[in-house]
Amino acid sequence: MDRNSFTAYGPATGAITESGEQENDHTKPHTWKTFAKYACFESEAERQWWNDSGALIARFLSLTNGDIDQQYQCLLFVRQVLIPALGPYPPVRRCCINTTEIGMELSLNFQGPGEPVFRVSIDPVSRMTGTPMDPLNINTVNNMITRLASMGIKGFDRTLHHHFTREFCMSEQSMQSYQRDSGEAIAWSQTILAFDFKGGDVVTKQYIWTRHAARASGLHPHSLIRRAISRVENQMHCSAAVELVLEYMETFNADIPVPFFSWDLVDPTQSRFKIYGISWQWSWAKAEEVCTLGGKLNHHDIDLLKKLWHILKLDEFTPTMGFTWNYEIRPGQPKPEVRLYLAICDRSDEEVAQAVVQWFELLGWHERAQSYPETLRYLHKTKSAHTWLSVTVSEKGVYTSLYYHPLGNGSDDFKIRENWF
């Protein structure tokens, strides 16, 4: 595809182009076009990110059916906060948040037959990133958190950011010696951010990887998690559920300790705490074990998850990515909710769309099922537009998220270049 033009298609639409011209009455030419027409960029890389992923994000936002004011608010946030944090274009720094190793991921969360919620996850980049000044990218994320705090975002709270970075992130001197002694040619970021766009508001989440702190301290990642949670138990009230999860991991998944965890950047008494697990064992038996914590929980509607497993034909082949899941723990909740992440990056978009349609029909989301293949028309026609499908089945309902390649102009064989910061 010509990188000088970007075309994205959506349900019953025309197109958004780099000039902003389109035929879709639903999105109108007022959002992305308005910002693109008179936008001033600090660098050519910012302009290219905006014309590529910025235009793609505009389409995602339009799918959430927010009104025009909400779309403006969200796009302004993307333009002013996210785009400057993406670094060089095309991207040159490897990131482990998705299968493309690009430091951004886009997703849609479907919570029923209504409109989905849009999310962006990013590994922020600055001139310090990956250098001896900030080898694990901690200072860059800290600076972005400071900027977010100054913006007066509704509900934004840095308390848990300060707590968990203090518990898990090393000092600058320790980071430098860690990079030298670890023998790693390049250090991956230790912490990243994600943003949910809901009704014109932005909800921020933070993730921290555990292995750097574990290696530097000589302590097991689970010991560090237990200690960190115990110090905020009077606010988060989640230690019982955390202990339940860690005991399961130590019994059934001991070869791969908790690789990372996340929380909401809100008041600690309202924040969820999520613990992630990874296994290279792709089988329904493993998935059932994960969902029941090795038999300790009676998972709500496990048979429904098994049907999704078969719809995705996960017994017929092994994905190239590991089987991933998380346990979501809410304040005061004695037991976690389980979310499975099923790799679909090895499938064609057509295969994935057919599976999603079948899944949505099974859930009774008939209109959403009928429209999903059409919503994919705006995505570039590659073999890997989709990366993951995640699902939670709880008493409140079924939550399904689909994750996508972040470059609207990306080609099938896009690879991170072998030069680094």
Curated annotation (Swiss-Prot):
Protein keywords: Transferase
Annotated CDD domains: PT-DMATS_CymD
GO biological process: alkaloid metabolic process
Catalytic reaction list: yaequinolone E + dimethylallyl diphosphate + H2O = [(1'E)-3'-hydroxy-3',7'-dimethylocta-1',6'-dien-1'-yl]-quinolinone B + diphosphate
Major enzyme class: transferase
GO molecular function per UniProt: transferase activity, transferring alkyl or aryl (other than methyl) groups
Family recorded in the similarity comment: Belongs to the tryptophan dimethylallyltransferase family.
Protein name per UniProt: Prenyltransferase asqH2
